[in-house]
Structure formats: C-alpha cells, structure tokens
C-alpha cells in the first residue's frame, strides 16, 4: 500500500508541475490533460488550482456547461474568500452565457450574498439576475434589481438598467412614470450614449401613447441631428418619423 501511495503521490505531483508548465507556455491541451489527471484524485492539495485552470479554458472555448460544473466544484471546495468569489463569478458568467435563467438567478443570488463583493461584481450580478428575471416574467423582482443598478448611470449596466426601468413602466402603460424616468436620465446624463439615445426613442413612444405626437416628433428630430453613431438608432428614428408624418 505504501508503495502505491508513493506512486500516486508522484503521479499527482508530476501532473501538477506539468499543468503549471502548460499554463506558463499557454499550452491549453497540456493544461486540460494534466488538470484532468489531477482531478481523478479529487482531494489533493492541487484540486482547486486544477479546477480554476480547466474551467478558465473551458469557458474561453465556450464550453459553458462544462465550465459551470467545474466552477460549482470549486465553490464547494474553496478554502479562501477569493477562490469562493472566483467560483461564484465563473458560475454566474457560465450560466448567463448559456442563457440558463434558473442557474443565472441562483448564481447571482449566491454571489450577492458574498460579504466582500466589489461594486463591479455586484453590478454584474444584479444585471444578469435582472435580465434572467425579465426572461422568466418575474417583472417585479427584475424591477428591484434594475432600480438598484439604475442609481449609477455612469456604468454601462446602470445606463442600460435606467432605460429598462422606463421600458418596463411603458409596457405597464404607466406613461407618466416612464416619462419622468427618462427625463431624469436625460438630466443625469451618462457616458453611454447608446442607452441615452434608446431612451429618447422610448420617450417618443411614450408621447405617442399619451397622444403628444408633436413632442414625440420633436425628440426624434433632435436625436437625429445630434446622434451619429453607426448602429440601429437611425433606423429606429426613421421608422417612427415615417409613422408620424
């Protein structure tokens, strides 16, 4: 037994060093091979590092279901806050990329329970959870997350959330509240011009619903003159102006 144990220990150590060398040389196949060998012995001192290395490659290769499985294992084994957070983040991103709403909501909720979460990771968790809630028609829960995000329109997630809050109000036929939300966004401003432009277009839709077609047209013309990015905004403006003739 002693000889076998020594043999397996040597095999584990060799696999670990080969995994590290593979990582340094950016040899993904070597990392996958040797991390896989290490993980055949689940309770080695190296299993967390092996899971981190393998999950990262699987995620980058878009094998999100396999990455999610590894990140879940890492979460269960993690011995430090940093590794637990890394696992939770990996779980969230993998689930979100798979568009698995149930897994995304679970991973985000798990992540938001972490004590030392950076504002960036908190925003990411709120954003992905809000989008998953919207997909699941859990509009009230989505609105809570979106409103929390929308407090800071300087971030990309915050800017999109501000627009989505107004969109939810518009869909609920709460036109006065939607108008107020968008005018507040315009006043606050944001470095993320696309979401501000989308909000101008939404405001024109709100005004059409309120039978203020002149105001709707004015906002569209103002946006047409001032927004010149190469995206889908121009088409949205033209479609609406055509209907307002």
Residue ranges of predicted features:
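Short solvent-exposed coil/turn linkers within tandem alpha-helical repeat scaffolds
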Residues: 8-9, 39-48, 75-84, 113-122, ...
């Amino acid at each position: 037994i002693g000889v076998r144990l020594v043999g397996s220990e040597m095999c584990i150590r060799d696999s670990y060093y080969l995994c590290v060398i593979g990582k340094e040389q950016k040899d993904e196949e070597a990392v996958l091979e040797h991390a896989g060998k290490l993980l055949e012995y689940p309770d080695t001192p190296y299993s967390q590092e092996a899971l981190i290395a393998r999950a990262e490659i699987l995620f980058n290769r878009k094998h999100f279901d396999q990455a999610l499985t590894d990140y879940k294992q890492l979460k269960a084994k993690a011995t430090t806050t940093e590794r637990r957070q890394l696992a939770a983040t990996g779980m969230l991103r993998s689930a979100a990329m798979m568009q698995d709403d149930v897994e995304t909501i679970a991973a985000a909720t798990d992540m938001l329970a972490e004590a030392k979460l950076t504002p960036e990771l908190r925003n990411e968790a709120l954003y992905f959870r809000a989008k998953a809630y919207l997909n699941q028609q859990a509009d009230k829960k989505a609105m809570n997350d979106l409103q929390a995000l929308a407090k800071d329109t300087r971030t990309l997630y915050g800017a999109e959330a501000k627009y989505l809050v107004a969109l939810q109000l518009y869909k609920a036929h709460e036109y006065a509240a939607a108008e107020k939300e968008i005018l507040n966004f315009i006043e606050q401003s944001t470095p993320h011009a696309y979401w501000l432009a989308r909000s101008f277009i939404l405001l024109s839709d709100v005004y059409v619903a309120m039978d203020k077609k002149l105001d709707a047209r004015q906002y569209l013309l103002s946006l047409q003159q001032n927004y010149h990015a190469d995206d889908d905004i121009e088409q949205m403006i033209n479609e609406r102006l055509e209907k307002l003739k």
